[in-house]
Design a protein with these regions (language model features):
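Short acidic, hydrophobic short linear motifs in intrinsically disordered regions
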Residues: 22-32
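Short amphipathic alpha-helical interaction segments
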Residues: 36-51
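Short, cationic-aromatic polyanion-contact patches
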Residues: 3-9, 60-80
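The C-terminal cap of the DNA-recognition helix in HTH/winged-HTH DNA-binding domains
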Residues: 19, 50-51, 97
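Hydrophobic residues on short alpha-helical segments
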Residues: 11-17, 92
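A short, conserved structural fragment
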Residues: 50-60
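Short helix-coil-helix linker/hinge
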Residues: 6-9, 22, 85
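Amphipathic alpha-helical dimerization/coiled-coil segments
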Residues: 77-115
Length: 115
């Protein structure tokens, strides 16, 4: 089953959830008010993400179904497919042109590639 799409504002919400879960929905609303300047929007986002299978809200306790890593991987796969024709070298080349990589970053990428 593919990972449900998490849009940008929903992702910011999920970042708060992933950091604090499990969390009471009232406490999550309070955090979103403080960090995102949301009030009633939070309840709408909770409902929408529950309907799409991203989070669950049981007995007013909100937890994630989709992990941060799963959401990041899904977004990366979509971007790689749409923008780079699934070419890791094209992606790395584009990233390297935009931002100079430090020797440490280059070494870390090398270690990851070599497995």
């Amino acid at each position: 089953m593919p990972t449900p799409k998490i849009f940008e504002s929903e992702y910011r919400f999920c970042l708060i959830l992933w950091e604090h879960e499990p969390i009471k929905s009232m406490e999550l609303v309070k955090l979103c008010r403080e960090k995102l300047d949301w009030s009633k929007t939070t309840y709408t986002v909770i409902k929408r993400l529950c309907e799409r299978g991203v989070i669950r809200n049981e007995n007013a306790i909100v937890t994630s179904i989709i992990s941060k890593e799963e959401a990041q991987m899904s977004e990366l796969e979509e971007m790689m497919d749409k923008k780079f024709e699934n070419s890791l070298p094209a992606f790395i080349a584009a990233f390297g042109r935009k931002q100079a990589l430090s020797d440490a970053q280059i070494e870390e990428i090398r270690r990851i590639i070599e497995g």
